[in-house]
Amino acid sequence: MAFQQDLDNRVPITGALMLATLMNTLDGTIANVALPHIQGSVSAAQDQVTWVLTSYIIATAIMMPLSGWISEKIGRKRMFILSIGGFTVASMLCGLATNLPEIVIFRIIQGLAGASLMPLSQTVMLDLFPLKMLPRVMSIWSAAIMLGPIAGPTLGGWLTENLSWRWVFFINLPIGIAALFVLQMFMADDPGGRQRPFDTIGFVTLTLFVGAFQLMLDRGPGQDWFGSTELWIEAGLALLGLYLFTIQTLSAEHPFFPRELGQDGNFVGGLTVNIFVGALLFSTGAILPSFMQNLLGYSALQSGYASVTRGLGSVISFILVPLLVARLGAKPTLLLGVVFSGLSLWQMSRFNLGMSADLILLSGFVQGIGVGLMFAPISSLSYATLAPRLRPEGTILASMLRSLGSSVGISLVQASLVSQSALGFSRLAEHVTAETPGFATGTAAIGATQGTANLALLRAQMARQGTMLAYDSIFAWMALLVCLLVPLILVLKRPPIQAPAAPASEALSE
């Protein structure tokens, strides 16, 4: 049988799935640092070049829910081949593009092709290994999920500075070709052809919600959020789509996502924690480079190198997770991850303008360990009680909500950073004006012109200090929020240890 053949070849299949997932997650962040170079190369305006990122995010968000249904119709292997092949070819075309419209079109193709890689690879790995091996398997899979966004900015900065911005896309070619070759050689053909009714209304309303919501989150910072008519329209469309999708899910005979997913307490609770962990990882990674570059004067490449310890901590945690779960259990390991994550954010809340790189490196290392200890066990717990036939839809829903949660986290943190920076500056500025007694006396002694210049310099320093206070406040709040995960983790059920169930593909056909 095809499933038995995959069991015999699960080591090379797992390696290929890791490569495909890493390629997908890497591409979500690697292009960020190359945007200024792309902008200059294709002569685009600042608000235009951001579509290189926006187009990819929206295409992925729209296609991801549909990928499960397509894979059931044509088979997983064909879906993987089409997705990896399409993603690899689109990456090559992005690197060869000569103008902005070409890059945006090819990035859309990238997003459409790569949307299925993360959820589908997780589904296959859940099928290939027994429940008792899930901690080890999910730690391997989580490595690709976490190392992509961590390594992306560093690798992107190095490629851009030493080669060209085009290499942030060309880097996908060897990865994609290797994954294609291994899957073609070792993964068994499956016929697909499952006749599950397609919920057209559910898909259209979900697409409306996800597309409008992602567009709102991506465009918000540059459009003054709800000071812009565009954002109000996008928010209205997102709410309308969510409302209609909810009604359709509750009333349809065959909804787009099975209602049984919401009845599994472990899946719902684990998904909530997973969303938060993803938001924590991505939002921290989103603001730390700007902190190091704008306040500490690091270059883009230096800030990337300073993030390497997060990856090192993650790698160590991936090695430790199976051992800790075997000795302590999944929930204690997860709680240990909460402790490390909270400690790292508390360390970050003590950042200051005169700090050395040591604290950045240490806090990043601790956070890498903490997030790694949380990511793999929560993935295991989430699917421990979920019926095999629900895994394809479950992994797709989890990937989609994790992506949305990360986008929400990044947007909230960035919006809070702007408002808190302004608040911090205003509080500091209240105490220093041209009429401040000590300052007024000094101005009289050195002359009004020099005094005014000194006041401008002082206000610039106060702006930097106000922004520093904003970062510290945000990290402190994030540390507090991490602690709120503890009650939710405690109610999760321990996964049963049993023989591997039939794979989702076989369970669905029964």
Task: Identify what each model region corresponds to.
Residues 178, 401-494, 499-510:
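Hydrophobic transmembrane architecture of multi-pass small-molecule transporters
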Residues 8-68, 101-103, 142, 163-164, ...:
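Transmembrane core module of solute transporters
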Residues 98, 130, 186-189, 221-222, ...:
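Short helix-capping/hinge motifs at transmembrane helix termini and TM-loop junctions
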Residues 49-50, 79, 137, 168-171, ...:
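Alpha-helical transmembrane segments of multi-pass secondary-active solute transporters
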Residues 174-191, 208-219, 237-251, 485-493:
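C-terminal membrane-cytosol helix-exit motif in multi-pass small-molecule transporters
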Residues 86-96, 175-182, 240-244, 316, ...:
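Transmembrane-helix signature of multi-pass solute transporters
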Residues 64-202:
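Helix-loop-helix hairpins in multi-pass membrane proteins, especially solute transporters
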